[in-house]
Curated annotation (Swiss-Prot):
Annotated family: Belongs to the YqgF nuclease family.
GO cellular component: cytosol
Example GO BP: rRNA 5'-end processing
SUPFAM superfamilies referenced in this protein's UniProt entry, alphabetically: Ribonuclease H-like (SSF53098)
EC annotation from Swiss-Prot or TrEMBL: 3.1.-.-
Function according to Swiss-Prot or TrEMBL: Could be a nuclease involved in processing of the 5'-end of pre-16S rRNA.
GO molecular function (one): nuclease activity
Name of the featured protein: Putative pre-16S rRNA nuclease
Keywords from the UniProt entry: Cytoplasm, Hydrolase, Nuclease, Ribosome biogenesis
Superkingdom as given in the UniProt entry: Bacteria
Xref: InterPro entries: RNaseH-like_sf, YqgF, YqgF/RNaseH-like_dom, YqgF/RNaseH-like_dom_sf
Subcellular location: Cytoplasm
Length: 140
């Protein structure tokens, strides 16, 4: 079963896809946001292309667990996906995923210019990998 991980942002949506066994997450692409409807069509295309059976969307909580303005936008996006898709959509805590993605890219010596283009899909893969690790531990 393939699972899609999404890192939702104001300008871009990072996309990661799991392997068929649900063990590893791989950053796939970055969707440059347009309208919600156009973004949805791109996501639907990826669901079909990768035969995705579940979607995980990272929820940007504050360090104290509270939800800020960015989380409210993400919640609206999740609600939109849940109403528009047959594929189940779940929420996953994404605290510090972008910070972790930035650290990984810096350690890999990726230039600042290139980091900007890939950070969202790396963050999506970190979100998805966290979910996969949790699921695998749960059902180990």
């Amino acid at each position: 079963m393939r699972i899609m991980g999404l890192d939702y942002g104001d300008r871009r949506i990072g996309v990661a896809i799991s392997d068929k066994l649900g063990m590893t997450a791989q950053g796939q692409e970055v969707i440059i946001r347009k309208t919600p409807e156009e973004d949805l069509e791109v996501i639907k295309g990826l669901i079909d292309k990768y035969e995705v059976e579940e979607i995980i969307v990272g929820m940007p909580k504050n360090m104290d667990g509270s939800l800020g303005p960015r989380a409210e936008k993400t919640r609206d996006f999740i609600d939109f996906l849940q109403k528009s898709l047959d594929t189940p959509v779940k929420v996953w805590d994404e605290r510090l995923s972008t910070v972790e993605a930035e650290r990984v890219l810096i350690e890999a010596d990726v230039s600042r210019k290139k980091r900007k283009g890939v950070i969202d899909k790396v963050a999506a893969s970190i979100i998805l990998q966290g979910y996969l690790n949790y699921q695998n531990k749960l059902h180990g």
